[in-house]
């Protein structure tokens, strides 16, 4: 059993980053809504608790409150932004609407304390240690609770961080979880290892053996059915479950006709031939295209593709004798987004295709071996299981596939043109060493024609857009500044090698305001 940090979520857009940063220090943690029950917290038995930021103000009537048990367990507590303000307000301090709001970079001067011990960005002209941090707050603590002292300040925020070192209670008004706070990771590392006394016991080699043991204990001699998509999550889940129970795993691979070039062949070679996994291949491309006829709305396309997949998968799963379990590649961000922790006020932010749905219709028990892992941990696990590097580190691909990379109605002709254009784009990125420098790259088919000149003749053909972004967390993204020579080479190849496309454009929109996918 791992020692664990509990993170209580008060609604900050950065909360997930806290969990990722803690995991990066080789410490296990879980993220749960702020209103979990005292019994849940007691049974979780955390060695430390982190209170996240959030959009609320502590002095409003319906302000979220920290469960009182947090301050009674006798474990270290770190409040971040709103978490610090809530801690201050509930322990006898005061919070006010700040006259000077801080959004962005700020410099803080720090005082000696365990949390900041040995951590600084520089020594200022007065000989005091300074930190460059990222602020995002409109309220501030204006009176410290009894027993607390100020451990960081600037002109706008006299109590930018506070500490009661007797109880190991700390609060920081800034966000140590974001990369903009240069020493943020070191501060969180100090908190979990030096203050909470956490060990370094969260790593993938150990996790593989633990996960295999858990799968065997749960499944016994039953068969497990898994919908294999070829994406990183389902692929790693399949490899892990197969390592645990061998031929008891049966994978169903539904080729919906909306995959990338040669993707179906690669998936079958990797799993059926190389890993000896039992894979049932269903060629359903025509069926999906028939159902998509005349549909132009992106959400309706998603629903149609999802519904068709469920029907086909269910038909095949029902043929498998002694199948008692449905395995899914659900990962921790899916669980967080769907408010997967069962708490009294946990609202669903959005439904996710991997959380819920199929088990009820199939009357199967659910097996989610990656449920507690972040994406980077899933990739690390995939390598530990021997999956090919190219598969483990391939860019994200949407569940509906090319169906949402073709604007408007999906037609067979469009899928063929897009497949070829996308393959050229990715091949050239790999050849130029840019594939792993980008977080996601793909082509988009625009169902409009433009005039061109091919030799001495006028052409009137389709347009393809290229999209490549760089991001750490996919919450925000910057368009990749690919070299002009590379873009020129890609454009020339697409236009010269693919009959039907005579214009290529490059998308230079960031997220926000644009999303990464076009639909």
Curated annotation (Swiss-Prot):
Positions of the GMPS ATP-PPase domain: 202-394
CDD domains in alphabetical order: GATase1_GMP_Synthase, GMP_synthase_C
Domain Glutamine amidotransferase type-1 positions: 4-201
EC number: 6.3.5.2
Coiled-coil residue windows: none
Active-site residues annotated for this sequence: 81, 175, 177
Pfam families, per database record: GATase, GMP_synt_C, NAD_synthase
Binding residue positions for ATP: 229-235
GO molecular function: ATP binding; GMP synthase activity
Catalytic activity: XMP + L-glutamine + ATP + H2O = GMP + L-glutamate + AMP + diphosphate + 2 H(+)
Gene3D superfamilies the record matches: 3.30.300.10, 3.40.50.880, HUPs
HAMAP family cross-referenced by the UniProt entry: GMP_synthase (MF_00344)
Oligomer and partners: Homodimer.
NCBIfam families assigned to the protein according to its UniProt record, in alphabetical order: guaA_Cterm (TIGR00884), guaA_Nterm (TIGR00888), PRK00074.1 (NF000848)
Protein name as annotated: GMP synthase [glutamine-hydrolyzing]
Top-level taxonomy: Bacteria, Pseudomonadati, Pseudomonadota, Betaproteobacteria, Nitrosomonadales
GN (gene name): guaA
């Amino acid at each position: 059993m791992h020692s664990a940090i509990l993170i209580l979520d008060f609604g900050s857009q950065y909360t997930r980053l806290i969990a990722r940063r803690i995991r990066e220090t080789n410490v296990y943690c879980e993220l749960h809504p702020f209103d979990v029950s005292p019994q849940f917290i007691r049974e979780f038995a955390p060695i430390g608790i982190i209170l996240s930021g959030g959009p609320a103000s502590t002095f409003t009537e319906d302000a979220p409150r920290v469960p009182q048990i947090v301050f009674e367990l006798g474990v270290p507590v770190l409040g971040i932004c709103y978490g610090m303000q809530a801690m201050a307000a509930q322990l006898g301090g005061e919070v006010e609407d700040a006259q000077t709001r801080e959004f962005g970079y700020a410099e803080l001067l720090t005082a000696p304390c365990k949390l900041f011990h040995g951590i600084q960005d520089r020594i200022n002209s007065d000989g005091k240690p300074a930190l460059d941090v990222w602020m995002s707050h409109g309220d501030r603590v204006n009176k410290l609770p009894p027993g607390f002292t100020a451990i960081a300040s600037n002109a706008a925020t006299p109590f930018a961080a506070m500490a009661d070192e007797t109880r190991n209670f700390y609060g920081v008004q800034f966000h140590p979880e974001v990369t903009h706070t240069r020493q943020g990771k070191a501060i969180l590392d100090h908190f979990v290892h030096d203050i909470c006394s956490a060990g370094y016991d969260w790593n993938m080699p150990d996790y593989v053996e633990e996960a295999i043991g858990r799968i065997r204990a749960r499944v016994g001699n039953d068969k497990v059915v898994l919908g294999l998509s070829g994406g990183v999550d389902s692929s790693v889940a399949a490899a892990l479950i197969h390592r645990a129970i061998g031929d008891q795993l049966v994978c169903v691979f539904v080729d919906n006709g909306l995959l990338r070039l040669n993707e179906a062949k690669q998936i079958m070679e990797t799993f059926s031939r190389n890993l000896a996994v039992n894979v049932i291949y269903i060629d359903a491309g025509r069926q999906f295209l028939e159902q998509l006829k005349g549909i132009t709305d992106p959400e309706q396309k998603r629903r149609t593709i999802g519904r068709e997949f469920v029907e086909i998968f269910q038909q095949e799963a029902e043929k498998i004798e002694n199948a008692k379990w449905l395995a899914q590649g659900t990962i921790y961000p899916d669980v967080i987004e769907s408010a997967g922790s069962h708490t009294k006020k946990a609202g669903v932010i959005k439904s996710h295709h991997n959380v819920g749905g199929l088990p009820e219709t199939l009357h199967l028990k659910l097996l989610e071996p990656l449920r507690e892992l972040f994406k980077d941990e899933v990739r690390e696990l995939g390598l530990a299981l021997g999956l090919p590097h190219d598969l483990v580190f391939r860019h994200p691909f949407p569940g509906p596939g090319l169906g949402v990379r073709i604007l408007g109605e999906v037609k067979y002709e469009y899928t063929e043109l897009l497949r070829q254009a996308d393959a050229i784009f990715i091949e050239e990125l790999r050849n130029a060493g840019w594939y792993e420098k980008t977080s996601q790259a793909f082509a988009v088919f625009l169902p409009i024609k433009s005039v061109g000149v091919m030799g001495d003749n006028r052409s009137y053909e389709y347009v393809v857009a290229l999209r490549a972004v760089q991001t750490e967390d996919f919450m925000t993204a910057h368009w990749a500044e690919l070299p002009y020579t590379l873009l020129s080479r890609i454009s020339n190849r697409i236009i010269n090698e693919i009959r039907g496309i005579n214009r290529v454009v490059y998308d230079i929109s960031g997220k926000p305001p644009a999303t990464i996918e076009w639909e």
